[in-house]
């Protein structure tokens, strides 16, 4: 399990990026960037690991963040029958919409959560955690909505940030000028 994910990480392209004068190494992977193509085999590999790792008992909804959580949310929904909710970058102004401030290591913006209601039992899944900025915005939004958080899982962990509560990861990596190194794996 996770051999396809690990291979995709170890062989993925790297680019240099810059933010605020700091140059850093950025890995480009199908699950975290949609480039190169996301294969069915990779999604099956990750979905099988998520199903074993997550507490999905009595879960009402899977919560994902736009955009790179959508494909893993779709795969997990197809495998479990549990519907998923996308936290969007666009405001819809629906009743009960929760506005989320988001600041990551790469960007700053606003997200919008709909269709999560009081008493919903939810799991959050996302492609990668590096600074924790996205999840730190989502957690208070779930409280505002009155949802019960059952579990959190990130496919890739780069940085192990403290988000105030425990979370699960499938693969922990480090990235340097030579590429991705796998530090730890759930399987």
From Swiss-Prot:
Catalyzes a salvage reaction resulting in the formation of IMP that is energically less costly than de novo synthesis. It comes from Methanocorpusculum labreanum (strain ATCC 43576 / DSM 4855 / Z). Pfam families: Pribosyltran (PF00156). This is Hypoxanthine/guanine phosphoribosyltransferase. Its EC number is 2.4.2.8. Belongs to the purine/pyrimidine phosphoribosyltransferase family. Archaeal HPRT subfamily. It is found in: Cytoplasm. One of its GO terms (molecular function) is hypoxanthine phosphoribosyltransferase activity. Homodimer. The keyword Thylakoid does not apply. It is an enzyme of class 2 (transferase). Keywords: Cytoplasm, Glycosyltransferase, Purine salvage, Transferase. SUPFAM superfamilies: PRTase-like (SSF53271). Transmembrane segments: none annotated. One of its GO terms (biological process) is purine ribonucleoside salvage. The keyword Transferase applies. Pathway: Purine metabolism; IMP biosynthesis via salvage pathway; IMP from hypoxanthine: step 1/1. It catalyses: IMP + diphosphate = hypoxanthine + 5-phospho-alpha-D-ribose 1-diphosphate; GMP + diphosphate = guanine + 5-phospho-alpha-D-ribose 1-diphosphate. InterPro entries: HGPRTase-like (IPR026597), PRibTrfase_dom (IPR000836), PRTase-like (IPR029057), Pur/Pyrimidine_PRTase (IPR050118). GO terms for cellular component: cytoplasm.
């Amino acid at each position: 399990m996770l051999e396809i994910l690990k291979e995709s990480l170890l062989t993925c392209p790297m680019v240099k990026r810059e933010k605020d004068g700091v140059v850093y190494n950025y890995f480009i992977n199908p699950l975290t960037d949609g480039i190169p193509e996301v294969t069915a085999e990779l999604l099956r590999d990750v979905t099988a690991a998520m199903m074993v790792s997550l507490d999905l008992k009595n879960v009402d909804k899977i919560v994902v963040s736009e955009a790179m959580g959508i494909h893993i949310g779709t795969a997990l929904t197809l495998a479990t029958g549990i519907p998923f909710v996308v936290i969007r970058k666009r405001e819809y102004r629906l009743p009960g919409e929760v506005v989320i401030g988001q600041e990551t290591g790469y960007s700053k913006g606003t997200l919008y959560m709909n269709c999560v209601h009081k008493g919903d039992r939810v799991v959050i899944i996302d492609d990668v955690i590096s600074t924790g900025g996205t999840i730190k915005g989502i957690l208070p939004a779930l409280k505002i909505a009155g949802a019960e958080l059952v579990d959190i899982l990130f496919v890739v962990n780069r940085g192990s940030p403290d988000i105030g509560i425990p979370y699960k990861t499938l693969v922990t990596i480090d990235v340097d000028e030579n590429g991705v190194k796998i530090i730890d794996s759930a399987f």
